[in-house]
From Swiss-Prot:
Belongs to the peptidase A1 family. Disulfide bonds join 333-373. Probable secreted aspartic protease that supplies the fungus with nutrient amino acids. May be able to degrade the selected host's proteins involved in the immune defense. GO terms for molecular function: aspartic-type endopeptidase activity. This is Probable secreted aspartic protease ARB_07536. SUPFAM superfamilies: Acid proteases (SSF50630). Its main location: secreted. One of its GO terms (biological process) is proteolysis. It comes from Arthroderma benhamiae (strain ATCC MYA-4681 / CBS 112371) (Trichophyton mentagrophytes).
Length: 417
């Protein structure tokens, strides 16, 4: 999903900066340990403020900035007048290093948005000391400013946004990693992701040791050569794809800061599927809830249902494999190895990248209590042919996903066994 947002205000200017890290540390990488929750991958490695306050941040490839749940509620500091009991937050009133930035960046409100849907997502701005492992910087924060009552606590206290940054973007909508790169806290603007999944009984999964016992690792400042398969990294330049805000991630006001790349071919096995010829076709990388499932069109999903002899099924809400609006279909669990891969090509003459059948089949439970295998496919778009889709957990299995903040490009590599 993209589960939370709650924001507040504060600001900027000339105040003591965070102490510089030693030179060798500035040039090294940091591995963010990731745990997989319903909303997506969260990390506990970041602290904010003085004295340092612990956080649990949602690492979100599709959010613009360093969003922080604060005490702000209806323009007061009555945090739990808006937040649900038990909600974790950053108490900005207790940080001696926080600086108000409302004079630099006006309050922003998005409605609709993909966190609170038709409730206001409002942010006010401040700067404070932000620590990622042993690295620290003074960053601009998006502080939550709620004007409504949350009905439940969200599983994190902020967002570690990782959207790409455009030249015209000021610090109020810049990813925290990008802000730290600009302050030379990292030698490189590269970041990489590996997924040590363990949700496919009967199949070989990456050892949790590869992720230091975690569900995933988001490496900041580069990538580990040991993870890259023998074919190396394929780099694809990102594109701005305006239809994303009409049918995929819908915000008002709109923004287009996504790791989106063009799709030039789409296959089921070796059978090519139709693309949209009017708008072109693209995918967005999102390893949170909107990125679950294999990205397919109405027509290609229908074809996969036919090939796999899948049958319509009603699933319990708790076991739905993704949050798409399409129907779900069950398949014979014993035939999974015979099903074709779902494939994509991201540029003429480039490699074809696959989601193997075992990666797009998920276990679920029917309304009458039966355990079934289902096609974990998510369909977005208008009309029959492929327009846009999101690639996340299912695509990331057995791959390394890289983002280059300095050149705005996506890198793909096989995850070395």
């Amino acid at each position: 999903m993209r589960g939370i947002l709650i924001l507040v205000a504060l600001g900027a200017a000339t105040i003591p900066q965070a102490s510089a890290a030693p030179n060798d540390r500035q040039q090294s990488m940091i591995d963010l340990p990731l745990k997989l929750y319903q909303n997506g991958f969260n990390t506990d490695l970041v602290t904010i403020g003085t004295p340092a306050q612990a956080t649990r941040l949602f690492v979100d490839w599709t959010w613009i900035g360093a969003y922080t749940v604060s005490t702000k509620c209806n323009h007061t500091n009555n945090a739990y007048g808006c937040l649900a009991p038990g909600q974790k937050l950053f108490n900005e009133t207790q940080s001696t290093s926080l600086v108000n930035q409302t004079n630099l960046y006006p309050t922003r409100t998005w409605n609709p948005n993909h966190f609170f849907m038709d409730k206001d997502l409002t942010a006010v701005f401040a700067s404070d000391i932000y620590r990622v492992g042993d690295r620290e910087s003074r960053l601009t924060l998006q502080l939550s400013q709620l004007n409504w009552k949350a009905s439940f606590p969200y599983p994190f206290s902020g967002i570690f946004g990782m959207s790409p940054v455009f030249k015209s973007d000021n610090m109020s909508i810049q990813a925290p990693f990008h802000q730290m790169v600009q302050q030379k806290k990292f030698h490189s603007g590269l970041t990489s992701f590996i997924y040590c999944y363990s949700d496919e009984p009967g199949y070989k999964s990456p050892s949790k040791e590869r992720c230091n016992g975690n569900d995933g690792i988001q490496t900041l400042g580069g990538y580990h050569h040991r993870d890259i398969g023998w074919r190396g990294i394929e780099w694809i330049n990102t594109i701005v794809f305006p239809i994303v805000n009409d049918i995929d991630f819908i915000y008002n006001p709109a923004f287009y800061n996504y790791w989106s790349i063009p799709v030039t071919k789409h296959f089921i096995g070796n059978e090519e599927q139709a693309l949209n010829t009017t708008t072109g076709s693209a995918v967005v990388f999102d390893h949170a809830s909107y990125g679950r499932g294999a990205a397919m069109s109405v027509a290609s999903y229908r074809r996969l249902v036919s090939i796999t002899n899948a049958q319509p099924v009603n699933l319990t809400m708790a076991t739905l494999p993704n949050n798409g609006k399409q129907k779900f279909y069950s398949v014979d669990c014993d035939r999974v190895d015979s099903f074709p891969a779902v494939k994509y090509q991201f540029g003429k003459w480039r490699r074809v990248w696959s989601i193997e059948a075992r990666h797009y089949i998920s276990k679920a439970k029917t309304m009458d209590g039966k355990d079934v295998c289902v096609l974990n496919v998510r369909v977005i778009g208008q009309g029959e042919n492929f327009v846009i889709g999101n690639l996340g957990e299912n695509f990331a299995k057995d791959k390394v996903i890289l983002f280059d903040f300095e050149k705005n490009r996506v890198g793909l590599a096989d995850f070395r066994d």
